[in-house]
Amino acid sequence: MLKRLAGACLLLLIIAICSGCSSLAYYQQAVFGQIELLSKKRDLVEVLSDVSVPLEVREKLRLAQRLTTFAEARVGLPVGSTFDSYADIDRPYVVWNVVATPELSMIPKTWCFPIAGCVSYRGYFSHEKAKLFAHTLRQRGYDVAITGVRAYSTLGWFKDPILNTVIHYSDPELASLIFHELSHQMIYISDDSIFNESFATVVEQEGTRRWLENTGHPDAIIPYQTKKRRQQTFISLIMNYRDLLSEIFGANQPDDWKRAQKQILFGHFKKEYKKLKHQWNGDSTYDAWMSRNLNNAHFASTGTYYHYVPVFQTLLADHQYD
């Protein structure tokens, strides 16, 4: 444990030297948030033998073990010591990401870091600190979204644990998460969030499909496929309106006209979602997303994960899904 803490503190020192003091407070919360996570890690073997741990938690962790084995053997993902431990951090999200766009643009603001490169979000281990940062961005005229994140990859810098934040996931959801995060250890391009997340999304989808088909879960395939079809329909709706908003913002018109058209489009978007929900027999999966005071940042953050998905899906099909 002391070795891990020393390593994290050294990392903070290196980052501070590279970045200057102006960003030191942000890096401090990032490093000490990671230290907190590391301090709560327990080896999976230890947790699985601890009868004081709820049975449903141990069963989900056993599934995680099987999933990492499958990820390495059947999906070709690098596993190593990733997900061979468990951490209960006693909160619903591990970090909160802040995404911001100009009021009349769909291009997200980026932040650059020594390790991850430039990314279109800024993560906080504290919800309150995320909200404070979001407030400063709003005061500067940005559209801002805060999104809770249940897991993330340190890209092999640390041995990432399974977190309590995902223990309630269904089996296919946990499979998707594990495949997604492991894919970042296979390929991660600095300064290209859209490529990285789109690639991970396709690996997640294909890996989960293979796992369901190869591990005797026929009863889960149809519900999973239904969920993914609805997800794709909803994402397509978001991407369509993102493009419409981009057209409005690029038009040779006054800013007041653009602002008015933006609100009109948000109204149309909500109406189309209501139609989808009716077609889905009242499925409320995306109600929480829709309940927010929608702005450009919500549409931009979704685009990060799905922009190149059709391209990667085509490449996968061209190579016979191998």
Feature roles, as predicted:
Residues A8-S19:
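Bacterial N-terminal signal peptides
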Residues I17-R42:
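Bacterial Sec signal peptide processing site at the extreme N-terminus
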Residues S236-D322:
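Pan-zinc metallopeptidase signature
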Residues L38-V53, W111-V119, R292, V309-P310:
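Acidic/histidine-rich, surface-exposed loop or edge segments in extracytoplasmic proteins
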Residues L67-Q231:
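Acidic/His-rich structured neighborhood in mature extracellular/periplasmic domains
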Residues Q34-A71:
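Amphipathic alpha-helical packing elements
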Residues D43, E56-E59, L63-R66, K129-L132, ...:
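Extracytoplasmic/secreted proteins, especially bacterial periplasmic and envelope-associated proteins
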Residues M1-C9:
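Bacterial N-terminal signal peptides that target proteins for export
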